[in-house]
C-alpha cells in the first residue's frame, strides 16, 4: 500500500499556509522605496517632497518623476504644496525664536553683540573684498562664502546677502559680475541665485575649478569642406578619403561611355583567367585600371629619359618637384638634371582666423521695468563683446512692478589659437636645380655632391625671376646654359598657405575668405565676427552667463580634407609646380674621346644592379695602370654574335686614373629579354648574363603613359609636343594618347586600311596557331589592332601638328586641308537629356527665354536633342517647346546662365519609341535656341556659355564629347578643346573653330587665321602664348571674339579689327592682295573705318585702295561672299553709297575704338609719343630679350 503524498501543513518544511514576509536587509528596502519614487511610483506627497528636494539641491529630477509631476491634478498639488509652505514657515519662526532666546540669556548683551559684529566683519574681510561697480557696492567672493549668510555692515545697518550660485570657483581671469537685488520681507527669490535684504549689491566671483576646464558651449562652427585640390601634387592630400569613391564613379562612367573598351577588357580578363574566380578578378582589375590610364594618369615617374635628336644644340626640359631628367644626345655627355627644391620665401600675411577663443570678465547690468535702459560701461572697450536683451522682473527679483526689464551683458574676448593665411608672391619663388655629368665616377664619389663638384662633374644653382638664365662650367666637359622660365605652374593668386597649429596647407583663396570664424587683418588687432566663437546663454533676472566654444581645430582639420600639406617655417617648400628650361648643349663636349682602349682585365666589383628605370648600373674594377683609357663595354644578344644591342647611358666611359684596381661606375640600358653585358677584349673579356623584363610594345605603351603623366602634372601651362611618331626621338615629346598612343607609335605611318589588314592577318595567324599561348597572343594583338584601327578613341587633351595643319582632341581629327575647309569628327552630347530638359524648364520659369550657342557644335547638339527634349517636356505636362533656329552671323554672347539642378524628368518606353518616329507638337511657350534677336526673346533674356566639357567618349565615326552645366559663370572659352604650340618658327593657337598661325621672321607676327565660325567667348590666358603686357588695342583678332591676348596676335601697321566682316561665313584672315586690286601707302588716305568688300552690291570690282601707314602685303578677309580688306585699307575715290561695309562692332557698348576717332593724319590714333611710334605701332621691347625673345622659349603644346 502506497502512502499518499501530503499531510498537515505544519509538518512541511515550508508552510504554505503561514508563509511570513521575506527577510530583506533594511537598506535594501530603503533603496527599493527610493527607486520606486524616482520612477514616479508612490504616494503623491512623497513624490512632491522628492521634487522639492531636487529643486532645493539644484539637481535634475528623472523623466519618470517629471512625468508623475505633470500628471498630478492641480487641486491635489496645491493642497500638498501649501502644507509644505506652512511647515517651512514654522521652521523659519522656530529659527528666529531660537536667536531671540539666545540673546536674552546673555548677561552682557552689548558686549556680546559688539564682539559678534566684529567677528563677522573680520570673517568677511578674510574671505570677501568690497569695492565699487557702476556706482554700487561690489563684493568679490570665493566658493567658501556661499555656505553661510554674507553680512555686510552698512550705514543703514547690516545688509545680509545670500549667494546660491552653483558655478562659484576660485578667482581667475574667467570672472562674472552681476547684481544681487534687494528682496523685501515675505517675497521668495525668483530666477535669481543671489539676493540681499537691505540694499542691492553687485557680486563678483571666479568660475575656474581645480578639476576641470571652464564651461564650454556644446555648439560648433560649421566649416565648409575644402574639397579636393585641383593642383597635381607629389604628396598625398590631407585626409583624402574621397578619391576611392570618385574613382569608382569614374570607372562606372567610363564603362557606360566606352563599351567597346569595356568589352575588350572583359574579354581579355576572361581569357587570362584559368578558372571563374580568376576571370572575375582579372576583369575587375582591367576595368579599374583602364579609366586610370585613359583619363587620370595617377602617380608621377621619378626619372624620365629625354633623347635629343641628332645634331641638336638644345632641348626643352620640364622639371617637376623631386624629379630627375636624364638627357642623352649624340656626341654629347649624358646629363642628369634634378629639381632639388621649390621654395617660396617672404610670405605676406593676409588674414588670421581665431579657432579657439576664451571668454573672461563677464559683467551684467540689469534694470527694473520703467527705470530706463541698462547700460554696461564696458561697452566702450573694443575688446568686449556686448549683448542687450530683456528679462522678466517682479517682486521675486527686486522690482516693484512686474514686466520686462532691460539687461546688458559684456564679456571680454581673447583669442587663444589662430590660423594664419599667407600669400605667395611669384617673385619670391626660387628653384634649386642640380646638374650632374655621367662621367667617370667611382663608387665612393657616387652621390657625393662635394666630390663631384670638385671634379667639375656637378653644379647646383638657383633660378629666380630676377635671374632666370645661368651658365655652368663643367671643367673638361665644357659648359652648359639653362634659360629657364620661372613659372611654377602654381597660380599664386588662387592659393594661400594656411597654418593651423603645427601643420600648413595650400588652400583655395575663396574657401579661405569664406571661413565662418573670427578674423583680423595684419594691420589691426581687433577681431571681427567674434560672436561666432561665443555663446550668450539664456538670461536670468539679473545674470547672464557667457561661454566660449571649444577649439575648432579638429573641425578645421576635417574640413581641410583634400588640401595639399606643405612645410612652412620662415619659407614654404612647394610640392606642386614645375620649371620650364631650355638646356643649351652646343658648348658641351665628350671627355676622353682621344683616349685609347683599356688593354688589361676588368672585373665586376659588384653584381650589376637594376636601377628601377630600365637601366643597369655596373661597378667595374680595372687591374691595369695604363689609364686614362676608354672602357670597352657593350650589350649583346648572344655571345656568338657581338652585334651591340641596347645603349650606354654613360657616354664614352673611361678610367680616369693610372692607379691599379681603380673602380668606375657605368650605366647602360640593355634590351628587353635576355642579353649579355660584355666588358673587355680578347681573352681578357668578361661577361654577365642579364634579363630585362618587359617588351617593346609595353615600352611604347609606357612611353605614351609618361607623356600623359607629364600632361597631368603640367596641366595647361606647358606641354612638350612632337609630331606623330615623335616618341622615338623624344620621350618628352610623346603625343598625349593612352591606348591609342602606343598604337600610333607602332603603326601611325600606315593607313587605317593597312592597319585593319594587319590586324586581320594576326587574327588569321592566331586561329591557325597550334600553341595556345601564341594563338591567344596573336588573337589579342590582332583584335586590339582591328579595334583601334576602326574606332575613334577618347582622350582629354588636344594636340597640334603644325606641319600637317592638324589638330587632335582625342583621336578626332580637325584637318585644315589644302582647300582650307574644316572637317570635324566631333559630336556634342548633354550629360543626360532628362536632366537638360529639367534645366530648360527651370530656366524658363526664372525668366530665361532661350540660349545662345557658343559654337556650332553646341548648336548641332541642341538640334540633335530638340525632339527628345520636347517629348520629355510634354510627357511631364510642361507647356514648353524647344525651338532651334538657324544661327545668323557670328555666335553672339548673352548675359544669363543656365543653372544646375539635381532633378530629372522621366519618360516611358512608349513615349520614347514614339519620339523616334514622330516629332511632338509645338507647345504654347517656346525656348528659343539661336536665330535672330526678336522682341519675344531678346538677347538680354537669353543664357550663354552655360556648358563645359566633362568627358570624351568614343564612336565609330565621331568622338563623343559629353557636356555638363558649368558651376561658375565665366566668359572664357572651354579650355578642354584648345591646343597651343610653338615649333621652330611657327606658333599656333587652335581649337575646334580657330586656327591662328604666327611666324617668326625677324619678329613674330600674325600670318594667317582660319575660322570655322566666329564666337564671342574670350580665349583663356592658361592657353595663351607670350601673353605678358599685351595691349588689347594691338590685337588684330579682337579678344571679344576669342582672339588670344598674345603678342603673336599682332602685325606691324595694323590695329584691332573690331569692325571686320566677322558676321560672314568661312572667314580666312591672311596678308595678301585681293584679286584684281592694288594698295598704295599715302598720307592722303582716309582714316580707319569698317572693313569694305572689294566688290560693290552690283558685283563691280573696286581696284584702287590705299592706307596711311600699313604694312604690305595688306590684311584681307576671304569669305564666302567675297574678299574684304582690313580697317586700315580704304577705297580710293569711290561712291560711298555703293560700298559694302561690315556692320559688325566687336567692341562692347562701353568700349570705344580709339583709332577710328584719332586726329586727321594719324592712322594709329594711339597716345604713343613720336619717338615710340614705328609705322603706327608703339615699340615695346620684349621682356625676354628683344626680337629673339619669343624664339628663346620652346612654347610647346598647352
Curated annotation (Swiss-Prot):
- Quote the InterPro entries the UniProt record gives: Env_glycoprot_M_flavivir (IPR000069), Env_glycoprot_M_sf_flavivir (IPR038302), Flav_gly_cen_dom_subdom1 (IPR013755), Flavi_capsidC (IPR001122), Flavi_capsidC_sf (IPR037172), Flavi_E_Ig-like (IPR027287), Flavi_E_Stem/Anchor_dom (IPR026470), Flavi_E_Stem/Anchor_dom_sf (IPR038345)
Designated name of the protein = Structural polyprotein
Annotated region Interaction with host EXOC1: the residues are 2-15
Enumerate the residues marked as the site Cleavage: 105-106, 127-128, 219-220, 294-295, 794-795
Q: Which residues form the propeptide?
A: 106-127
Q: Name one GO cellular component term.
A: viral capsid
Q: NCBIfam families this protein is in?
A: flavi_E_stem
The keyword Secreted is annotated on this UniProt entry: yes
Q: Which cysteines are joined by disulfide bonds?
A: 297-324, 354-410, 354-415, 368-399, 386-410, 386-415, 484-581, 598-629, 798-809, 849-937, 973-1017, 1074-1123, 1085-1106, 1107-1110
- State the organism of origin: Japanese encephalitis virus (strain SA-14)
TM helices/strands, residue ranges: 110-130, 254-274, 280-294, 747-767, 774-794
Q: What is known of its domains?
A: The transmembrane domains of the small envelope protein M and envelope protein E contain an endoplasmic reticulum retention signal.
Which residues bear sugar attachments?
A: 142, 448, 924, 1001
What are the start and end residues of every segment in region (Disordered)? 1151-1177
Annotated region (Hydrophobic), positions in chain: 37-72
Matching Pfam families:
Flavi_capsid (PF01003), Flavi_E_stem (PF21659), Flavi_glycop_C (PF02832), Flavi_glycoprot (PF00869), Flavi_M (PF01004), Flavi_NS1 (PF00948), Flavi_propep (PF01570)
Q: Which GO terms describe its molecular function?
A: protein dimerization activity; structural molecule activity
Where is the region Fusion peptide?
Answer: 392-405
Query: What does the entry give for GO biological process?
Result: clathrin-dependent endocytosis of virus by host cell; fusion of virus membrane with host endosome membrane; viral translational frameshifting; virion attachment to host cell
At the top level, the lineage of the source is Viruses
What keyword terms does UniProt attach to this protein? Capsid protein, Clathrin-mediated endocytosis of virus by host, Cleavage on pair of basic residues, Disulfide bond, Fusion of virus membrane with host endosomal membrane, Fusion of virus membrane with host membrane, Glycoprotein, Host endoplasmic reticulum, Host membrane, Host-virus interaction, Membrane, Secreted, Transmembrane, Transmembrane helix, Viral attachment to host cell, Viral envelope protein, Viral penetration into host cytoplasm, Virion, Virus endocytosis by host, Virus entry into host cell
- The record's account of how the chain is modified after translation: Genome polyprotein: Specific enzymatic cleavages in vivo yield mature proteins. Cleavages in the lumen of endoplasmic reticulum are performed by host signal peptidase, whereas cleavages in the cytoplasmic side are performed by serine protease NS3. Signal cleavage at the 2K-4B site requires a prior NS3 protease-mediated cleavage at the 4A-2K site.
Its lineage reads: Viruses, Riboviria, Orthornavirae, Kitrinoviricota, Flasuviricetes
Amino acid at each position: 500500500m502506497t502512502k499518499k503524498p501530503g499531510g498537515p501543513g505544519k509538518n512541511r518544511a515550508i508552510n504554505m499556509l503561514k508563509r511570513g514576509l521575506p527577510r530583506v536587509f533594511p537598506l535594501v528596502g530603503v533603496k527599493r522605496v527610493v527607486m520606486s519614487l524616482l520612477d514616479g511610483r508612490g504616494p503623491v506627497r512623497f513624490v512632491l517632497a522628492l521634487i522639492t528636494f531636487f529643486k532645493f539641491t539644484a539637481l535634475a529630477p528623472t523623466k519618470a518623476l517629471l512625468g508623475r509631476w505633470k500628471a498630478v491634478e492641480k487641486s491635489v498639488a496645491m493642497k500638498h504644496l501649501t502644507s509644505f509652505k506652512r511647515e517651512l514657515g514654522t521652521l523659519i519662526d522656530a529659527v528666529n525664536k531660537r536667536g531671540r532666546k539666545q540673546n536674552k540669556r546673555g548677561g552682557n548683551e552689548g558686549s556680546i553683540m559688539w564682539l559678534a559684529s566684529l567677528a563677522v566683519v573680520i570673517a568677511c574681510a578674510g574671505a570677501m573684498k568690497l569695492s565699487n561697480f557702476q556706482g554700487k557696492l561690489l563684493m568679490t567672493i570665493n566658493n567658501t562664502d556661499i555656505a553661510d549668510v554674507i553680512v555686510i555692515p552698512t550705514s543703514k545697518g547690516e545688509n545680509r546677502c545670500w549667494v546660491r550660485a552653483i558655478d562659484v570657483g576660485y578667482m581667475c581671469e574667467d570672472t562674472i559680475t552681476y547684481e544681487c537685488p534687494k528682496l523685501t520681507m515675505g517675497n521668495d527669490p525668483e530666477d535669481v541665485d543671489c539676493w540681499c535684504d537691505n540694499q542691492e549689491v553687485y557680486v563678483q566671483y571666479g568660475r575656474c575649478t581645480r578639476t576641470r576646464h571652464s564651461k564650454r558651449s556644446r555648439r560648433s562652427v560649421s566649416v565648409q569642406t575644402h574639397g579636393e585640390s585641383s593642383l597635381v601634387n607629389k604628396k598625398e592630400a590631407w585626409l583624402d578619403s574621397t578619391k576611392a569613391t570618385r574613382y569608382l564613379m569614374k570607372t562606372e562612367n567610363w564603362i557606360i561611355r566606352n563599351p567597346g573598351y569595356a568589352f575588350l577588357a572583359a574579354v581579355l580578363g576572361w581569357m587570362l583567367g584559368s578558372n571563374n574566380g580568376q576571370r572575375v578578378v582579372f576583369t575587375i582589375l582591367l576595368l579599374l585600371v583602364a579609366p586610370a590610364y585613359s583619363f587620370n594618369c595617377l602617380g608621377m615617374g621619378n626619372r624620365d629619359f629625354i633623347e635629343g635628336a641628332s645634331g641638336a644644340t638644345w632641348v626643352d626640359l620640364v622639371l617637376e618637384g623631386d624629379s630627375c631628367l636624364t638627357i642623352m644626345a649624340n656626341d654629347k655627355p649624358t646629363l642628369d638634371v634634378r629639381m632639388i627644391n621649390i621654395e617660396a620665401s617672404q610670405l605676406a600675411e593676409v588674414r588670421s582666423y581665431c579657432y579657439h577663443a576664451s571668454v573672461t570678465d563677464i559683467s551684467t547690468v540689469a534694470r527694473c521695468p520703467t527705470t530706463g535702459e541698462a547700460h554696461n560701461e564696458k561697452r566702450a572697450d573694443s575688446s568686449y563683446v556686448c549683448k542687450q536683451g530683456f528679462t522678466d522682473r517682479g517682486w521675486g527679483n527686486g522690482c516693484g512692478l512686474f514686466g520686462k526689464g532691460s539687461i546688458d551683458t559684456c564679456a571680454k574676448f581673447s583669442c587663444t589659437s589662430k590660423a594664419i593665411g599667407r600669400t605667395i608672391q611669384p617673385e619670391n619663388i626660387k628653384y634649386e636645380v642640380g646638374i650632374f655629368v655621367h662621367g667617370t665616377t667611382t663608387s665612393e664619389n657616387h652621390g657625393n655632391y662635394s666630390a663631384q663638384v670638385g671634379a667639375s662633374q656637378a653644379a647646383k644653382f638657383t633660378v629666380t625671376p630676377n635671374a632666370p638664365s645661368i651658365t655652368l662650367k663643367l671643367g673638361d666637359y665644357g659648359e652648359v646654359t639653362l634659360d629657364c622660365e620661372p613659372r611654377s605652374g602654381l597660380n599664386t593668386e588662387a592659393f594661400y598657405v594656411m597654418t593651423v597649429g603645427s601643420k600648413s596647407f595650400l588652400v583655395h583663396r575663396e574657401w579661405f575668405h569664406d571661413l565662418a570664424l573670427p578674423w583680423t587683418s595684419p594691420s589691426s588687432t581687433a577681431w571681427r565676427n567674434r560672436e561666432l566663437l561665443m555663446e550668450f546663454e539664456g538670461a536670468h533676472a539679473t545674470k547672464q552667463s557667457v561661454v566660449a566654444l571649444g577649439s575648432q581645430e579638429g573641425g578645421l582639420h576635417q574640413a581641410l580634407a583634400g588640401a595639399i600639406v606643405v612645410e612652412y617655417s620662415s619659407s614654404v617648400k612647394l610640392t606642386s609646380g614645375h620649371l620650364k628650361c631650355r638646356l643649351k648643349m652646343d658648348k658641351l663636349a665628350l671627355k676622353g674621346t682621344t683616349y685609347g682602349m683599356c688593354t688589361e682585365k676588368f672585373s665586376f666589383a659588384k653584381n650589376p644592379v637594376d636601377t628601377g628605370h630600365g637601366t643597369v648600373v655596373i661597378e667595374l674594377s680595372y687591374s691595369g695602370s695604363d689609364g686614362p683609357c676608354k672602357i670597352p663595354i657593350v650589350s649583346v644578344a648572344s655571345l656568338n654574335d657581338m652585334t651591340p644591342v641596347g645603349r650606354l647611358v654613360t657616354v664614352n666611359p673611361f678610367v680616369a686614373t693610372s692607379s691599379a684596381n681603380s673602380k668606375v661606375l657605368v650605366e647602360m640600358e640593355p634590351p628587353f629579354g635576355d642579353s649579355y653585358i660584355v666588358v673587355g677584349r680578347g681573352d681578357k673579356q668578361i661577361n654577365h648574363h642579364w634579363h630585362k623584363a618587359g617588351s617593346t610594345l609595353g615600352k611604347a605603351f609606357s612611353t605614351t603613359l609618361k607623356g600623359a603623366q607629364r600632361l597631368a602634372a603640367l596641366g595647361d601651362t606647358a606641354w612638350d609636343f612632337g609630331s606623330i611618331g615623335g616618341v622615338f626621338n623624344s620621350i618628352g615629346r610623346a603625343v598625349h594618347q593612352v591606348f591609342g598612343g602606343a598604337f600610333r607609335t607602332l603603326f601611325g605611318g600606315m593607313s587605317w586600311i593597312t592597319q585593319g589588314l594587319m590586324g586581320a592577318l594576326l587574327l588569321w595567324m592566331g586561329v591557325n596557331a597550334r600553341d595556345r599561348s601564341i594563338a591567344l597572343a596573336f588573337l589579342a594583338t590582332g583584335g586590339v589592332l582591328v579595334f583601334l584601327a576602326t574606332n575613334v578613341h577618347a582622350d582629354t587633351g588636344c594636340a597640334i601638328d603644325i606641319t600637317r595643319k592638324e589638330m587632335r582632341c582625342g583621336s578626332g581629327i580637325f584637318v585644315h586641308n589644302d582647300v582650307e575647309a574644316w572637317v570635324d569628327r566631333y559630336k556634342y552630347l548633354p550629360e543626360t537629356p532628362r536632366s537638360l530638359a529639367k534645366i530648360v524648364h527651370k530656366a524658363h520659369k526664372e525668366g530665361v527665354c532661350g540660349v545662345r550657342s557658343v559654337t556650332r557644335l553646341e548648336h548641332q547638339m541642341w538640334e540633335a536633342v530638340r525632339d527628345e527634349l520636347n517629348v520629355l517636356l510634354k510627357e511631364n505636362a510642361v507647356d514648353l517647346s524647344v525651338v532651334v533656329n538657324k544661327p545668323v552671323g557670328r555666335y553672339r554672347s548673352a548675359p544669363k546662365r543656365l543653372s544646375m539642378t539635381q532633378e530629372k524628368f522621366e519618360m516611358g518606353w512608349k513615349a520614347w519609341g514614339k519620339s523616334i518616329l514622330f516629332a511632338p507638337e509645338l507647345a504654347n511657350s517656346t525656348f528659343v535656341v539661336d536665330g535672330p534677336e526678336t522682341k519675344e526673346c531678346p538677347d538680354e533674356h537669353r543664357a550663354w556659355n552655360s556648358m563645359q566639357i566633362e568627358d570624351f567618349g568614343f564612336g565609330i565615326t565621331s568622338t563623343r564629347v559629353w557636356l555638363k552645366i558649368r558651376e561658375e559663370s565665366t566668359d572664357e572659352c572651354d579650355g578642354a578643346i584648345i591646343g597651343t604650340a610653338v615649333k621652330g618658327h611657327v606658333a599656333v593657337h587652335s581649337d575646334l573653330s580657330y586656327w591662328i598661325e604666327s611666324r617668326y621672321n625677324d619678329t613674330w607676327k600674325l600670318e594667317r587665321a582660319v575660322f570655322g565660325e566666329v564666337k564671342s567667348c574670350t580665349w583663356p590666358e592658361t592657353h595663351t602664348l607670350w601673353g605678358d603686357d599685351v595691349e588689347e588695342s594691338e590685337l588684330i583678332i579682337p579678344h571679344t571674339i576669342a582672339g588670344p591676348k598674345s603678342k603673336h596676335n599682332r602685325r606691324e601697321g595694323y590695329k584691332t579689327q573690331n569692325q571686320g566682316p566677322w558676321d560672314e561665313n568661312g572667314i580666312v584672315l591672311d596678308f595678301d592682295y585681293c584679286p584684281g586690286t592694288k594698295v598704295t601707302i599715302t598720307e592722303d588716305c582716309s582714316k580707319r573705318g569698317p572693313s569694305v568688300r572689294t566688290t560693290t552690291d552690283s558685283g563691280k570690282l573696286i581696284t584702287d585702295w590705299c592706307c596711311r601707314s600699313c604694312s604690305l602685303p595688306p590684311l584681307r578677309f576671304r569669305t564666302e561672299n567675297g574678299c574684304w580688306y582690313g580697317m586700315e585699307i580704304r577705297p580710293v575715290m569711290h561712291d560711298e553709297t555703293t560700298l559694302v561695309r561690315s556692320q559688325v562692332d566687336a567692341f562692347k557698348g562701353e568700349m570705344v575704338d580709339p583709332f577710328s576717332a584719332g586726329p586727321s593724319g594719324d592712322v594709329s590714333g594711339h597716345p604713343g609719343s613720336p619717338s615710340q611710334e614705328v609705322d603706327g605701332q608703339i615699340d615695346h621691347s620684349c621682356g625676354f630679350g628683344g626680337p629673339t625673345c619669343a624664339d628663346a622659349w620652346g612654347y610647346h603644346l598647352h
